[in-house]
Amino acid sequence: MGIGHNPRLCLVPLILGLLCGGVGMTPLPEAGPQSPCSLEGVEIKGGSFRLLKAGQVLEYLCPSGFYPYPTQIRTCRSTGSWSTLQTQDRKIVKRAECKAIRCPRPQDFENGEYWPRAAYYNLSDEISFRCYDGYTLRGSANRTCQGNGRWDGETAICDDGATYCPNPGIPLGTRKVGSQYRLEDRVTYYCNRGLTLRGSEQRTCLEGGSWSGTEPSCQDSFMYDTPAEVAEAFLSSLTETIEGVDAEDGHSPGEQQKRKIVLDPSGSMNIYLVLDGSDSVGAHNFTGAKNCLRDFIEKVASYGVKPKYGLVTYATEPKVLIRVSDPKSSEADWVTDQLNQINYADHKLKAGTNTKRALLEVYNMMSREVNQFKETWNRTRHVIIIMTDGLHNMGGDPVTVIHDIRYLLDIGRNRKNPREDYLDIYVFGVGPLVNQENINALASKKDKEKHVFKLQGMENLEDVFVQMLDESRTLGLCGMVWEHKDGTAYHKQPWQAKISVTRPSKGHESCMGAIVSEYFVLTAAHCFTVDDEKHSIKVSLGGQRKEWEVKEILFHPKYDLNAKKAKGIPEFYDYDVALVRLKEKLKYETTIRPICLPCTEGSIQALRLPRSTTCQQQMQELLPAKDIEALFVSESKKTLTRKAVYIKNGDKKASCERDALRAPGYEKVKDVSEVVTPRFLCTGGVDPYADPNTCKGDSGGPLIIHKRSRFIQVGVISWGVVDVCKRPQQVPGYARDFHINLYQVLPWLKEKLQNEDLGFL
C-alpha cells in the first residue's frame, strides 16, 4: 500500500516564550551555617528560618496561608545581636510566630451596605455589597479573600451619577476624607498604622470627569502581587502606551493593528531599563532580573515592535550600558548582547545604593533627545522599567529626579494638556527586602492603571513576563506559542491539527496538519484519496472535543501517487501537499494559532529581517547549505511531543537521499532522483546525531524551524524509509524521513491562499 510505513493514515502547536531560564526559587543566595550573630532564640513558632547574605540577614519562612509576624526579615547588627522584633507601628514582640493571612475589612462603605460584617476575614471568605435605592453599584458585588491577603475583583462603589466626577470609592482597608466630587475637589486616603499606602494618597477631580492618580490600597508587609495580577495590569497599561504611539501616525488602533504594532523607526517610543545591582539586592536577584529583561526584549521584538532602548545598572555609581542615541539601540539582538555582558560583580567594589544617580542618567538621555529632536521630541513616549528592592542609602531622594523628568517632558504642567500618556514608570520590587513606600513613590500613578508591583521571588517575576507578553492581542501573529510551565501541549504547539478520515471498508485513518490561516490547514496529499467524501473528513484543533467540518480538499495539481508505476515505482510522493479548507472560520485562541509560512510578511517579521528581504534571501537564512536544526511534532499516548532533528542540506544531503533506495518497493530503482526530487528535504540517520524518526500518524504534519522565539514551517512530512515505530529498539542507521520543501511549492500556496491576508512576497 505504501513505501516503508506510508501512507501514514493513522493517529499521530513594554511588554515576554519561555522566560527567565535558570532563575531559581531562593530570593537571595543562602549563606553557610555560620553567622556573626547567635542563632539562639531566633526560632519562629510554626515556621522556619534561613540565613542570607553571608549570615547578615535572617529570613523567616511560613507555610502557605501564613505570614511571619511581626517581621519577615531581621538583620545582624554590629553589636552581635539581631534587630529587635517589632511591628510596623513599633510594638515590641518577644517571639516571632506564623500568623494566618487575613484580608482587610472595610473601614467604610458609602451609600450601601455589606455583609457579613466581621472584625477580620480569613482566606476564601466572601463579602457582598448592595446599594441603597437610587444608587447604582459599580465594581464587584461579591469578593473573595485570596491567598495573598487581598480581595479579588474591583472596588464596590455606590454612585447616583449626580456629581461632576464619579464617586472614587473606598478601596477595602482604606479610609477616605472628602465627599464632594466637583471639579478640582480633592479626596485623601489613609491607612491604619502599620500598613503602607500604595497608589495615590490624594486624588483631584479633573476636567472631563476623571480622577488624577491611581486607586490606592493599603499593604501589609506579607502582601505580594500575584503574577497574574501583575501581568494583566502591566500589559494593559503598556499596551495603551504602544497603541497611543500607533495612533500618533494616524492609524486607528483596531484589533488587527493591536496585534501587528510597528513603531516609527525614528524612535516614537523609548524604553529605559534600570537594574539595581547594589549589595542589598544580591547576585541571585540581579541575575534573575537581568534574565527577565533579556527575554522581555526578545519577546517584544518577536512581536515586531522596535522601540529604542536605554540600559542602566547601578549601585554606588551608575553604569550606562546602552543609550537611546546609540545607532543600534532599536536592534533587539544587539541590545540583548549588551545586557548579557553585564555582571553583578561589576558593582562589587562600590556596592551602595544610589538610585538617584541612575535616574539622572535616564534624565540625561531624555534631555539629549529633547535638544536633538526639537521638532518631534514631544511625540516620543517614554517607558522606564525599574527593578529594585526600593532601598537607597546615598545620593539623596530619587523621587526628585522623577519630578525633573516630568518637567523636562512637559508632563502635568498644563491642566488642559497634561501629557500623562507620554511617560510611564513601572517599578518591580522582588524579594523580602522590598521597601514598599519607596517603590510606590517612584512609580507612575494613573487612573485605572497600576505601575508598582511587589513579587515574592524571582520565579514569580518569570511568571509575570510569560503571562504579560502572550495575551489575546497577539493571537493573530504566526508561529507564536505559550511556553509557560502550566501550558498544555496545544499551548506549545497551537498550530497542530489532527485530520481524521472515515472510510467504510477501512474504519478511521488519520494524519497531521498545520493551521496556516483562519480557513486553511496544510497537510500531505497522500492523506486522502479521490473517493473520500468531504463529510467523512474531520479536523480536530487545540485539543478540543469539537471537530471542524471540511468544505474542500485542494491537491497540488502535479501530485500523482501512481505517476511512475510503469517504471516499477509503486508510489511516487513528489508534490505531496494539500490544503484543507474548513467550513467555519477559525477564532484564534491560545491553543489555536497559525504557524508561519515561508516568504510571507509574517515570517519576515518573525525573523526580524528587513522589509526589503526577498524570498530567496529568506530561504538562504532558513535553509543554508549545512545541517539545519529543525523539529517535528509527534503524538504519543494522546499527547504532543516535539522531536528535534537535523535537515541534511550540506555535505550529508546526498547520503541521506541515497538511503531512500532502501525503502520497501524501491529495491530495483537505480537512480535516487527517480524517487527523491528537488522538492524533498531529508532528515534522519545517525550523523551528526541520531535523529528521531516520524511515525505512521505524523504524515502531513509540519517540519519546523524554531528561530528568534518563533516557529516557521519549511516542510510537510511525506514518507519514510522504515517504520521505526513498530520496532523502536531496532532503528537502523539508514532510517530516513522525507518532507516536501515548501519553498518549492510556493507558487501553488500563493495562488490558493491569496485571499487569506498572509502577504506573500
From Swiss-Prot:
Enzyme class: hydrolase
Example GO BP: proteolysis
Keywords tagged on the record: Cleavage on pair of basic residues, Complement alternate pathway, Disulfide bond, Glycoprotein, Hydrolase, Immunity, Innate immunity, Magnesium, Metal-binding, Protease, Repeat, Secreted, Serine protease, Signal, Sushi, Zymogen
Stretch forming the signal peptide: 1-25
PTM description: Cleaved by CFD following activation of the alternative complement system, generating Ba and Bb chains. Cleavage and activation takes place when CFB is already associated with complement C3b.
Domain VWFA: 270-469
Glycosylation sites: 122, 142, 285, 378
InterPro entries hit by this protein: Compl_C2_B, Peptidase_S1_PA, Peptidase_S1A, Sushi/SCR/CCP_sf, Sushi_SCR_CCP_dom, Trypsin_dom, TRYPSIN_HIS, TRYPSIN_SER
One MF annotation (Gene Ontology) recorded for this entry: serine-type endopeptidase activity
Domain Peptidase S1: start-end pairs: 477-754
Site (Cleavage): 259-260
PROSITE patterns on file: SUSHI (PS50923), TRYPSIN_DOM (PS50240), TRYPSIN_HIS (PS00134), TRYPSIN_SER (PS00135), VWFA (PS50234)
This enzyme's EC code(s): 3.4.21.47
Disulfide bonds: 37-76, 62-98, 103-145, 131-158, 165-205, 191-218, 478-596, 511-527, 599-615, 656-682, 695-725
Subcellular locations according to the entry: Secreted
Domain of life: Eukaryota
Protein name per Swiss-Prot or TrEMBL: Complement factor B
Organism: Bos taurus (Bovine)
Lineage: Eukaryota, Metazoa, Chordata, Craniata, Vertebrata
